[in-house]
């Protein structure tokens, strides 16, 4: 799943110093970054998460991702227009634990989908993740997370589910349209600075742009 480059705390601090983060964002090192992310998502924030080894493959699977609450249909416009700068009609995908798939998707064969490569029809609870399904036919190209596949993302889903009663998130790659996915801390901070994102979880660092900061 995660065979790409990794980074350490030294690289994070060096990248933040180089980017002059203190001038345009508030940054704090937190012990339980996963609960901080989940609380922000439950409060309506859109959060970029950069942690651990990068994904190797066609999809962002949580370590170089933008996450949001898919129950809010307005996040589709927000991410497309203000963050990723891409066409309005381009859909997003959901991520959930595989054990929760039956709550949201029609998957009679109980197929695994750890790489976000299979499409499923949404079931009657589609309003709970309306921003992460295709609006034309209510299908979803879902990432069904296996236990232990990504402990951090699993923890975020767990905290978010406890806070909201919904056990699904919107997951899309952390990049601007036409640019590669952010790899390490330098790219993560550059993308953060140039996008309309307000929140970034960079390993165990929580960054929020200061009021008035423009991309």
Where do the model's predicted regions map?
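Flexible beta->alpha loop and helix N-cap segments adjacent to enzyme active/binding sites
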Residues: 1-215
């Amino acid at each position: 799943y995660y065979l790409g480059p990794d980074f350490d705390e030294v690289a994070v601090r060096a990248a933040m110093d180089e980017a002059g983060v203190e001038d345009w964002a508030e940054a704090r090192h937190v012990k339980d970054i996963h609960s901080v992310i989940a609380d922000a998502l439950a409060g309506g924030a859109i959060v970029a998460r950069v942690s651990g080894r990068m994904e190797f493959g066609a999809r962002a699977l949580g370590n170089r991702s933008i996450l949001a609450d898919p129950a809010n249909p307005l996040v589709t416009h927000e991410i497309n227009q203000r963050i990723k700068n891409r066409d309005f009609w381009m859909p997003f995908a959901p991520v959930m634990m595989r054990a929760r798939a039956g709550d949201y998707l029609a998957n009679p064969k109980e197929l695994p989908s750890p790489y976000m490569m299979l499409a499923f029809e949404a079931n009657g609870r589609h309003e709970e993740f309306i921003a992460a399904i295709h609006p034309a036919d209510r299908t979803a190209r879902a990432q069904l997370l296996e236990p232990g596949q990504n402990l951090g993302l699993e923890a975020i889903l767990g905290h978010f589910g406890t806070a909201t009663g919904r056990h699904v998130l919107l997951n899309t790659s952390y990049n601007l349209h036409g640019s590669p996915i952010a790899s390490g801390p330098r790219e993560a901070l550059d993308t953060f600075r140039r996008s309309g994102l307000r929140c970034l979880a960079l390993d165990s660092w929580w960054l929020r742009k200061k009021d008035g900061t423009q991309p």
